[in-house]
Amino acid sequence: MNMERKNFEKWWSENLFSGKTEYEHHGKKIQMPSIEEFSNSWMGSILEKDRVKVRKNFKRYKSILDVGCGGSPEFYGIQKFKKLKYTGLDITPEIVELNLAKGINCVVGSANQIPFEDSSFDVVHSRHVIEHMEDYKKPIEEMIRVAKFLVLISFFIEPLETGESIKSLDNENTEYEIYHNQYSKSEISQLLETNNQVKSHKYSKLEGQSKTLLKIKISK
């Protein structure tokens, strides 16, 4: 079953964020997690191989924006970098409230319209977010805009090497209604090569929950 983005958002608002205790997904009754349980269930360990490898890119910088932060696992992962100031960004107010209650600096906002000025953060990081977006162009452009030196994007669905992106992958084997896209490296590269704020970009393999890292160096 493929799902349009508007139907995906409607499903989530009517189920996870409605206070229901259970929901039906492809004919199965599934227990509805609380907002906190849901947020934590998608965090994974801060010691995941892919997280550790990506995190090595943070250490020389002083500020980071975590786009689509969820429960903000990277806040805990960067504690050894004493000079690095963390800010989380998530579109779900309930999740942001949970983070704030834990003392984590976090704001409500969309990756399509990041509520910060140009070059506000040394590093902008996003993990497992782009695949859920209706299009990759605007969120990537926004991350580049607010970054001063570096943008790091981790993909859990490995991008295609060439060809056109695939929209709305099948989600029948998931417990939730999920909106997934598989994007194309060649299409993303074309976008980056025409952006005068991009100095260079590189794809590399990751092990763990993430499959591919896109590293974008900024020139401003």
Task: State the predicted function of each range.
Residues 1-113, 140, 181, 208-212:
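Conserved N-terminal segment of class I S-adenosyl-L-methionine
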Residues 125:
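A conserved beta-strand element that flanks and buttresses the S-adenosyl-L-methionine
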Residues 128-132:
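Short catalytic micro-motifs in class I SAM-dependent methyltransferases
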Residues 133-142:
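A short, conserved alpha-helix within the catalytic core of class I
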Residues 149-157:
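Conserved beta-strand signature within the Rossmann-like core of class I S-adenosyl-L-methionine
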Residues 167-187:
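Acceptor-substrate binding/catalytic loop of class I
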Residues 197-208:
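Conserved S-adenosyl-L-methionine
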Residues 215-220:
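C-terminal lobe and adjacent flexible extensions of AdoMet/dcAdoMet transferase-like proteins
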